Each structure stands twice: as structure tokens, then as C-alpha cells.
Regions:
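Intrinsically disordered, low-complexity regulatory segments
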Residues: 1-169, 173, 350, 468
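Conserved short loop/turn motifs at secondary-structure junctions
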Residues: 1-3, 110-111, 188-191, 269-278, ...
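Basic, low-complexity terminal or inter-domain segments flanking catalytic cores
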Residues: 2, 77, 81, 125, ...
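Accessory interaction regions appended to the cores of large information-processing enzymes
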Residues: 17-23, 47, 53-55, 154, ...
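Metal- or metallocofactor-binding catalytic centers and their adjacent structured scaffolds
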Residues: 244-280, 286
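Amphipathic alpha-helical transducer elements in NTP-driven molecular machines
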Residues: 9-16, 33-36, 40, 59-62, ...
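C-terminal or mid-to-C-terminal helical accessory/interaction module adjacent to the motor/catalytic core
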Residues: 87, 100-101, 142-225, 269-270
Length: 684
């Protein structure tokens, strides 16, 4: 008898059908020599500190570093603390019996780091010694499952994947437990949550927020002139230089305004080739879905997982944007399946010979890029179809021809001032045919040459301002997590450094959602805005190692090395233990920042707590409320008296000393809105 374990019941049901295990029992299917059972996520996890006899938050217990981690069934929170989930215990009992009674286990959990850990933790907790093989597949179609079952791999082949997963799990426990307890002890009240990846991610959101809010725009002035060619084409030239001095710009403008001609000093024409975009991995799919359709990262992952389980796409939690040669051989057949879908048939038929930019087996690790399986979608919701069509569209783009443009740049001299004009004409649409060109052609006369004189038919002087980097969206935050905050646009360069990012494609959505759940960040349209609680925490930890984005990226790189067999997981464990001790010490030492004064001010939100006055924030002492009111507003720190007035009356009087983004001082009333966030009210 063989036992197959899947990650969730729906997958187990499909596998059971294929192997002929058609009889339903409590917690498994059976028949034809197979038992097919399932987990539902992590059934087993490392024990909380209570599992090692450590209760409560006490500085003398820190850092908590177990010599060996104890595994326990998944816990649920109750009024009396944590206890094992009854449903989990019941399923573990079923799995234990099946594992111990069978001759061979077939591991069919998701083919990735977390899927491996789900099984290995369970196997270790049970104390099982039954040999196991690995079902490693990239889609859940009947064909893929059957081929995978014919080509099972020895379970030990994935030991390094398990070591990396286990190292990640233990590192998150060590950093999360110790950092959370240390900063909570330092604060003296409430509970703050910190994490190995969560905190650097919050730091990126807060840093961008402050860069945006504290940005001082600079005014600039730019000259322009227009000329009309004999064929009727009107071309606009812009001055290369942008002038800070308005009077100097106006003086130059008057010169241009008073002249009738300009001389072309340089005409450069060249052919520009735009490579096809690479196929989607999970992160780029999430970024595009957010920027184009407003989907959250978590929403996109959930839909992609649903499409995968519906056999419509390949494994979504991939970090690769490439496919191997054997998968490429199937692409013509997959494109042919699209001829039955009117929206895509014309585009699919236009691809006579798929191009190879996304084909590189050396850049495929556990799973290749996300592609369709050839199964036809039926009864999908609008949201599900949107993600499916994005994957189809990207496949069509990736296997189309390159886009070729004729690009022209003309430089002109007018009154000693250098002006430029740029033109671009699509010569061959290639992959841009799929969605259409994103910009219209800009035509420049093709008979212009160096030394030619053009007529100045019009001139103008415009004024603009420099702009700050925008607040992070989920799309830009995912990009920053992928590259540790480095601004990299090139697809291939992003792929080259993806091991240095923070988090993994499979975990980044959950990390972002954690920031919302902790009350550190909120959504404002598409933008991510830190709350006062998030900013207050950032202020405390921003210079500490736990908020160091680059260091977190180095840990992720080490985990990738463990997975490839290039690093011993024990060396990683020693390093993370040292790091844990360091950050715990740093966080415990920040008590002075959290020093506070008691007050008799009642919390305006909950009506029961008392407000405590800290250096940078005033906060409610009711643990169920914890309302934070950040002191700094537009470059001004509110005094204790001003804060008391705000808390007591819901608003202050007119206060002076605020400074706008442009650096101008202004006066305003600070008041609460309906959610007890602060806002400015301007006196009439």
C-alpha cells in the first residue's frame, strides 16, 4: 500500500481520482493500492516560548534561543492561551496511521520550499521512518500528474530544499519572537510586532513616505519653439537646459521670441530594437495586476493559486521568468489552443515561429515561468479571467517578434541656446501588436540634415516643479522587495539579483498584508501610507539592524545558497543566532526612547484609557485601543500643552510654525477626523 499526501483536500481529490482511490474515508481516499490524504497548510509548527517553559515577557529570558526546536500541532488562540487545533489533531492522527501502515509515502505537497516543509515537519513530528518519494510537477493537469507519478524522484533529492525551508522557519521564529518581546519590554506597554522581513519592509514604506512629505520642490523654467515643415508637420523643440532663475529664463525667451530661425546642429537617425518582455513570474504578475487593475498582491496570488488548482496555469509561486527547452517544445501546441478564443485567436495565429528570449534552462530552478496549460477556462469570475488573460497576453508578447522603431533626435541652435526634438516611428510592431503601441508615433521630417535652417513659427516659456518620488504602491513595494530597494528597470538584471531580495515570491504578499493587519500601514487609493503607529515604530528602529534592508537581503541570499547546496544550514543557524542576540540587545536598549509621562487625559477614542506622553508620540494605555497620536506635523513638533488641547477638545487653537512642502510657513488648526487621524483645518 502507498500513501500519497497532498497539501490540501482539493488536490488530494484530483490525485485520488487519477490513481483510482475512489472510496472516501474519514480524512483520506482509498482504493487501487493507494491511500490519498491531505494536510491543510502547516499542520505542525515550532512551539512558542511556552513550549520551552518560558512564560510572559521578561528581559532576563532574552534572547530565547532553543538548542533544538520542538514541533507541536498548529495552535489556536483561546481565552486561556494557545492550544492545539482540534481539527488539526484529528487529521494528524489519520496521517500518522496511514504513514506507519504503508510501504511507501509519495509526497505531493506543493513543489516548493513551503510545500516541502509542510511534509517534513509532519514526518519529523510523527517520528516516521517509512521511505518517501517526491512528486514534483509544475501543473495539476491529469497529464502532468500521470507523468509525475511515472517519474517519481527520491525524496532525499530535496533535502537541501528542506534545510533552506527549515532554516527560514527557525530564523523567522528567532527574530520575530525575540524582537517582538524586546521592543515590547522597552516600550513598557502594549505589544509591538517585529519580524525578519516585516520590519525592513515597513522601513521601506516609511522611508519613502518621509522622502515624499519632506521633499521641497524646486521651480524651473524651460524654453520651447515650434517650427512647421513644408509638408505641414509641426515639430516642437525644448531647451536642453531647465533654468532656476526666472529672470534669466525670461531674458533668453525674449531673444528666441525675437528671432525667425534656428540652425540644426545635429541629426541622428537610428533603428531601435525593443526586446520582447520575459514571461511572468509571480512578482511581476502581482506588480502588473496592481498597477493595471488595482489588485492587491494577496488577491493576485489567491487567484493564481485558484487557476493553478483548476489546471489552467502552471505553478504560480515561481521566481523564474524563463522556461526550459522541453517546455518550449510545447509552446506551439499551447498557442494553438488559443485559436478557439476569439479575443486571442488573431494574435495567436500571427505567431508563426515562437521566439526564444524567455528560453534558458539554466535560469529555471524549481519551477519555470507561469504559462497556461492548454485547458480551456470555463465559468471564471471577471477577476479570475483578468489574471488568466494577463498570463495569456504575456505569453503572446514573449513569443512574438521584437518591436523595431526608427528613432530620430534633432539638435538645434537658436540664439546660442541648445534645443532638442525627438521622434519615434514603429517600423515593425512585433510584440507590441498584442496590446497595441503604448505611445503614438512622433514624426520628424526625414529630409532634415545638419546645417539646415528652420523657421521659428512660435515660442513659449513654461514653468514647472521638480516632483518627489511617489508613495509606494504594492507594485513598487514588490519591486523594491525584489531588489532590496535598488531602482532596476531591466528585466534581465532584476532576474540576476533576485536571490538578493527580501522575502520570496511566495511570501511577499503575506508580508505586505501583515503590515496592514498590525495597523502599521493603510491603503489610500493605490498608495501605501504608514499610520502614526507605523511611523512611531519606524522612528525607533530605523537605524537598527532589524530594519536593515540590505542585511535582510543577504540572509535571503544565504537561504538560496542552502537550497542549492552551496552553504551548510548550520552555519546559517549560527549567524542568525548572533544576529538575534545583537538585535535583541539593540531593542532592549531603546527604553529611553519609549520613556513617557503619565497624564489624566482620557483617550478620545475608547473613552477608558489614559494617554501617555512619549517623546515622539502620545498613546492610549488601553491595550485594546492603543490610539497613537504622532507629535510631528508638517515640520513642527506639538508641545504637551498643544497635545492635551487636541485630546481634550478634539482640536487645537490656531498654531504657527508649520512648513509646507514648498518650504513656506503656515498656520493651521490640528483636529481629529472621524477615525481619530489628525488633519489640518485652515482658519478663514
Amino acid at each position: 500500500m502507498k500513501t500519497i499526501i497532498a497539501e490540501k483536500p482539493s488536490v488530494a481529490r484530483e490525485i485520488a481520482r487519477i490513481v483510482g482511490a475512489t472510496e472516501r474515508e474519514e480524512g483520506y481516499f482509498t482504493g487501487n493500492g493507494y491511500n490519498v490524504t491531505w494536510a491543510f497548510g502547516h499542520l505542525v509548527q515550532p512551539a512558542l516560548p511556552e513550549g520551552y517553559g518560558i512564560r510572559g515577557f521578561h528581559p532576563e529570558n532574552l534572547p530565547i534561543i532553543p538548542q533544538v526546536f520542538t514541533l507541536v500541532p498548529r495552535q489556536v488562540k483561546t481565552d486561556k492561551g494557545y492550544k492545539a487545533d482540534a481539527g488539526v489533531m484529528k487529521q494528524i492522527k489519520v496521517i500518522t496511521r496511514l504513514f506507519n501502515e504503508c510501504d511507501k509515502i509519495i509526497v505531493a505537497t506543493d513543489a516548493g520550499r513551503e510545500g516541502e516543509l509542510i511534509f517534513r515537519y509532519l514526518y519529523e513530528y510523527i517520528g516516521c521512518a517509512t521511505p518517501f518519494d517526491r512528486l514534483w510537477i509544475s501543473s495539476l493537469t491529469d497529464k502532468a500528474i500521470r507523468e509525475g507519478l511515472k517519474n517519481l524522484e527520491c525524496g532525499s533529492k530535496y533535502d537541501n530544499l528542506y534545510y533552506a525551508a527549515k532554516a527560514r522557519s527557525e530564523a523567522d521564529w528567532l527574530v520575530g519572537i525575540n524582537a517582538t518581546q524586546a521592543i515590547t519590554l522597552a516600550a513598557g506597554r502594549g505589544t509591538y510586532s517585529l519580524g525578519r522581513v516585516q520590519t525592513p519592509t515597513l522601513a521601506m514604506v516609511c522611508k519613502r513616505f518621509w522622502e515624499n512629505k519632506r521633499f521641497t520642490p524646486e521651480t524651473f523654467h524651460q524654453l520651447h519653439f515650434g517650427t512647421e515643415h513644408k509638408d505641414g508637420t509641426v515639430v516642437k523643440f525644448d531647451s536642453e537646459e531647465k533654468y532656476k532663475d526666472k529672470s534669466a529664463a525670461e531674458e533668453l525667451y525674449n531673444k528666441v521670441k525675437g528671432t525667425r530661425s534656428a540652425t540644426l546642429t545635429k541629426v541622428v537617425r537610428k533603428e531601435k530594437t525593443e526586446d520582447t518582455p520575459l514571461l511572468y513570474d509571480l512578482t511581476t504578475l502581482q506588480k502588473d495586476a496592481n498597477s493595471k487593475h488595482g489588485f492587491t498582491a494577496e488577491q493576485t496570488l489567491a487567484i493564481a493559486q485558484k487557476l493553478y488548482e483548476a489546471k489552467l496555469i502552471t505553478y504560480p509561486r515561481t521566481g523564474s521568468r524563463y522556461i526550459s527547452e522541453d517546455v518550449f517544445a510545447e509552446i506551439p501546441k499551447l498557442l494553438q489552443t488559443l485559436k478557439n478564443r476569439p479575443v486571442w485567436s488573431l494574435y495567436a495565429l500571427s505567431i508563426k515561429k515562437p521566439t526564444r528570449r524567455s528560453v534558458d534552462g539554466s535560469k529555471v530552478t524549481d519551477h519555470h515561468a507561469i504559462i497556461i496549460t492548454g485547458e480551456l477556462p470555463k465559468h471564471l469570475s471577471n477577476e479570475d479571467m483578468t489574471i488568466y488573460d494577463m498570463i495569456v497576453g504575456r505569453m503572446l508578447e514573449a513569443f512574438s517578434e521584437k518591436c523595431i522603431k526608427d528613432v530620430t533626435q534633432v539638435t538645434a541652435d537658436c540664439c546660442g541656446i541648445i534645443f532638442t526634438a525627438k521622434g519615434s516611428v514603429i517600423k515593425k510592431e512585433g510584440w507590441r501588436y498584442i496590446y497595441g503601441a503604448d505611445k503614438k508615433d512622433v514624426l520628424l521630417p526625414d529630409d532634415w540634415n545638419e546645417g539646415d535652417t528652420v523657421t521659428v513659427n512660435s515660442s513659449s516659456l513654461t514653468t514647472g516643479q521638480t516632483k518627489p518620488k511617489p508613495l509606494h504602491t504594492e507594485a513598487s513595494l514588490l519591486a523594491a522587495m525584489e531588489t532590496c530597494g535598488k531602482d532596476i528597470e531591466d528585466d534581465e538584471m532584476r532576474q540576476a539579483i533576485k536571490d538578493c531580495g527580501i522575502g520570496t515570491p511566495a511570501t511577499r504578499a503575506a508580508i505586505i498584508e501583515t503590515l496592514f493587519a498590525r495597523g502599521y500601514v493603510v491603503r489610500a487609493d493605490k498608495s501605501l501610507v504608514p499610520t502614526e503607529k507605523g511611523l512611531a515604530l519606524y522612528y525607533v528602529v530605523k537605524e537598527m539592524q532589524i530594519a536593515d534592508v540590505a542585511m535582510t537581503g543577504e540572509w535571503e541570499q544565504s537561504l538560496a545558497k542552502i537550497e542549492r547546496g552551496e552553504m551548510d544550514d548550520r552555519d546559517f543557524r549560527r549567524g542568525i543566532e548572533e544576529y538575534t542576540s545583537l538585535i535583541t540587545s539593540e531593542l532592549l536598549s531603546c527604553q529611553k526612547i519609549f520613556g513617557h509621562k503619565e497624564s489624566e487625559c482620557t483617550c478620545p477614542k475608547c473613552g477608558t484609557g489614559k494617554m501617555q506622553f512619549f517623546h515622539k508620540v502620545v498613546r492610549c494605555d488601553n491595550k485594546e485601543c492603543g490610539l497613537p497620536i504622532f507629535r510631528q506635523k508638517a515640520g513642527k513638533d506639538l508641545t504637551d500643552d498643544e497635545m492635551k488641547e487636541l485630546i481634550t477638545n478634539g482640536k487645537t487653537g490656531v498654531l504657527k510654525g508649520f512648513k509646507s512642502k514648498q518650504g513656506k510657513k503656515f498656520s493651521a488648526i490640528v483636529a481629529f477626523d472621524s477615525d481619530f487621524n489628525t488633519q489640518f483645518i485652515f482658519p478663514k
